[in-house]
């Protein structure tokens, strides 16, 4: 890949300094002065770039690798060509993430779009009653309503709408085109482009002439270190709050219904829809395009396979998949049985046609 102007290389760090900083073992002390400026995949990494491997599947690519160093665990060190030093770590994936963030800090959250001479653009609207702590940046066309409180170091992107009385913590980034209503955000929260936070939930009751709208007077509570992907929507509660727990990461185009409570350090992949009033524990991982029924409980540490349909409670510490979602071993057994039946049917159909 040619020079990337969006994320230019770092001015350079020595391999020995990277190893010392993150507690990794450098396989060749003589390579400690080598300068690393960026990261890249194994197949195209150059001498000033780091790459990483997690399995022996990368062995063939390593034969022609030109990387400045390869991050791996001790069990895979033997795969690394002798001319390339290894950075050995018990958690190579984590180390790669840490080094990447160090080399490319601007890629860790949405960047400023406008070149600004002042912290608050004259093309933005900030209500006189709003309180902005020092260092808040507000880009053009943003609208900040009455009674809003925004913490120090937070960046508000172009075209963002922040409704009245919303509170946003410190060192947050609200990217262009997002809207935040009836919400309280903690510190170090990232909201990506086009996300919608705090609009009313989908609540209706049957009436004599059709559907009657049910009042939605709850809030959205987003705790510290949460990241919300582009075009994701999080509805405010009906009467209670919708809550996103500390450290949870939500991908693009996820729908979270009213009154949902998601625990700490969960991962929710794109296309997931979570219906109202569902409770999700800590450390839960939900694969892409999964549908989650309302008014159910998913326990701590659950893993749900992509494109599943979760219709009832899921016990803590389990792995579920399929439609309807069931324990993974049952799902895999059922799939094997279905495939075997299909093959048998095809075989019989072929014999009949050939007869």
UniProtKB/Swiss-Prot annotation:
Active site: residue positions: 258
UniProt cross-references to InterPro entries, sorted A to Z: Hexapep, Hexapep_transf_CS, LpxD, Trimer_LpxA-like_sf, UDP_GlcNAc_AcTrfase_non-rep
Pathway membership: Bacterial outer membrane biogenesis; LPS lipid A biosynthesis
Protein keywords: Acyltransferase, Lipid A biosynthesis, Lipid biosynthesis, Lipid metabolism, Repeat, Transferase
One Pfam family named in its UniProt record: LpxD
Gene Ontology CC entries for this record: membrane
Keyword Repeat included in the entry's annotation: yes
Reactions catalysed, as given in the entry: a UDP-3-O-[(3R)-3-hydroxyacyl]-alpha-D-glucosamine + a (3R)-hydroxyacyl-[ACP] = a UDP-2-N,3-O-bis[(3R)-3-hydroxyacyl]-alpha-D-glucosamine + holo-[ACP] + H(+)
Domain of life: Bacteria
Gene Ontology MF: a single term: N-acyltransferase activity
BP terms from Gene Ontology: lipid A biosynthetic process
CDD domains: LbH_LpxD (cd03352)
EC number: 2.3.1.191
SUPFAM superfamilies assigned to the protein according to its UniProt record, in alphabetical order: Trimeric LpxA-like enzymes
Presence of the UniProt keyword Iron in the record: no
Function summary: Catalyzes the N-acylation of UDP-3-O-acylglucosamine using 3-hydroxyacyl-ACP as the acyl donor. Is involved in the biosynthesis of lipid A, a phosphorylated glycolipid that anchors the lipopolysaccharide to the outer membrane of the cell.
Recorded family membership: Belongs to the transferase hexapeptide repeat family. LpxD subfamily.
PANTHER family cross-referenced by the UniProt entry: UDP-3-O-ACYLGLUCOSAMINE N-ACYLTRANSFERASE, UDP-3-O-ACYLGLUCOSAMINE N-ACYLTRANSFERASE 1, MITOCHONDRIAL-RELATED
Assembly information from the UniProt record: Homotrimer.
Name this polypeptide is given: UDP-3-O-acylglucosamine N-acyltransferase
Organism lineage string: Bacteria, Pseudomonadati, Pseudomonadota, Alphaproteobacteria, Hyphomicrobiales
Gene name linked to the record: lpxD
